[in-house]
């Protein structure tokens, strides 16, 4: 099943990069990424451009939709992303979320015409968020309770919705 992954970003290249790392590790291969940029500068564009070739090698298209920074207009650029998406199934996330490798596979497996599939997020501490490196996403270590506790998340993470 072909999916379009849409998310917004604004002047957060560090978190955008981590979001793209998570999407790069997806076990489901039939998707495109549409980044809805609400007026970020050149650093954001550079992150997208740097990773675009890696996605292309997997057959995944990454499109960067940009609008000038004229204040908070996130909804406008997301609406444009919806219009420009090429699949009939849209998956929304955020530009600071790191998706588990099975995120899109679960969406594809559970998709049902006429229904919405809703998920949630788990807010990490700033220490844990900063500690996430590409290798942690590649190996999925950043979703392991031991890694999370070692990086400032505390004991409650074992019972969280983040881990299986």
Residue spans for each PLM region:
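Short, acidic, metal-binding catalytic loop of nucleotide-sugar glycosyltransferases
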Residues: 21-30
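Short alpha-helix within the catalytic core of nucleotide-sugar-dependent glycosyltransferases
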Residues: 20-21, 45, 87, 101-112
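Conserved donor NDP-sugar-binding/catalytic core segment of glycosyltransferases
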Residues: 102-140, 148
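A conserved acidic beta->alpha catalytic loop
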Residues: 22, 37-48, 97
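Cell-envelope/extracellular polymer assembly enzymes that use nucleotide-activated donors
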Residues: 2-4, 32
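Glycine-rich, basic loop-to-helix element that forms the pyrophosphate-binding segment
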Residues: 68-85, 102
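Short aromatic/hydrophobic "clamp" motif used to bind/position activated sugar donors
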Residues: 90
């Amino acid at each position: 099943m072909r999916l379009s992954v849409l998310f917004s970003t604004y002047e957060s290249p560090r978190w955008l990069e981590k979001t793209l790392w998570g999407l790069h590790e997806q076990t489901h291969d039939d998707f495109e990424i549409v980044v809805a940029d609400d007026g970020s500068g050149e650093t954001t564009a550079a992150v997208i451009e740097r990773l675009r070739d890696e996605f292309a090698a997997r057959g995944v298209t990454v499109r960067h939709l940009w609008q000038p920074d004229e204040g908070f207009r996130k909804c406008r650029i997301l609406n444009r992303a919806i219009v420009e998406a090429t699949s009939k199934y849209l998956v929304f996330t955020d530009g600071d979320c790191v998706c588990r490798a099975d995120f899109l596979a679960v969406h594809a497996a559970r998709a049902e015409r006429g229904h919405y599939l809703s998920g949630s997020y788990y807010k990490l501490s700033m220490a844990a968020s900063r500690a996430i490196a590409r290798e942690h996403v590649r190996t999925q270590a950043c979703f392991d309770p031991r890694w999370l506790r070692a990086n400032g998340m505390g004991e409650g993470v074992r019972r969280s919705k983040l881990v299986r």
